[in-house]
């Protein structure tokens, strides 16, 4: 077992698991309801010894994990102010934690990525508010685009063990994410279907039963599911956090809101 994992495995404080609605990259530069919520989480939650991030913006064929000592800050967006591109989040990586994930997720093959990726705005865009000093070791786990929703929920179950090792699970996405219907100007009130789906998610956070029957695994069965998520990558991170729930811990909503008609900023806290 690697030294880092040996050190943290005896942690007596169970770390929470978070799903954060990250929204626009502009949140990095702004002070608003959502960014203040992320700041409060960083100030009030137990400080983790390391963080595993699942971001909507690393959507791959197969599963990968960042395994470099100093992951780069990825500015995976275009058309924003230069100040955003000048912002970096130099949190250290953790090859030891990456190797721990390889062992924990076996027999699922996990590729150790030492050069292709880093921390994208789905991860650093929220963590720069939670932990602005960028001094907590982090790895980012990719989302396998070839797998069904139930598989991602089960991945959360596997990752749950890390919470007892001093490691926080942070998943970043948006449960309603339809950029084709975003209201860029004028009336920005939520579409009825966006509100309906957002409420459906909230109502089923504590559902218990067979994974294959979970309403949030079968989210496309909801009448607003496809409109709310024409592609799955921003929704699936939620399932990692729900999979890490033990069925008894409190589930709370640190902040919520729907911006520009069809962008949910709902956040969910486990523990």
From Swiss-Prot:
Cellular component GO terms held in the UniProt record: cytoplasm
Cellular location(s): Cytoplasm
Role this protein plays: In vitro, opens the cyclic ring of dihydroxy-phenylalanine (DOPA) between carbons 4 and 5, thus producing an unstable seco-DOPA that rearranges nonenzymatically to betalamic acid. The physiological substrate is unknown.
Protein name per its UniProtKB record: 4,5-DOPA dioxygenase extradiol
One Pfam family matching this protein: LigB
SUPFAM superfamilies, alphabetized: LigB-like
Primary localization class, coarse: cytoplasm
Catalytic activity: L-dopa + O2 = 4-(L-alanin-3-yl)-2-hydroxy-cis,cis-muconate 6-semialdehyde + H(+)
Species this chain originates from: Escherichia coli (strain K12)
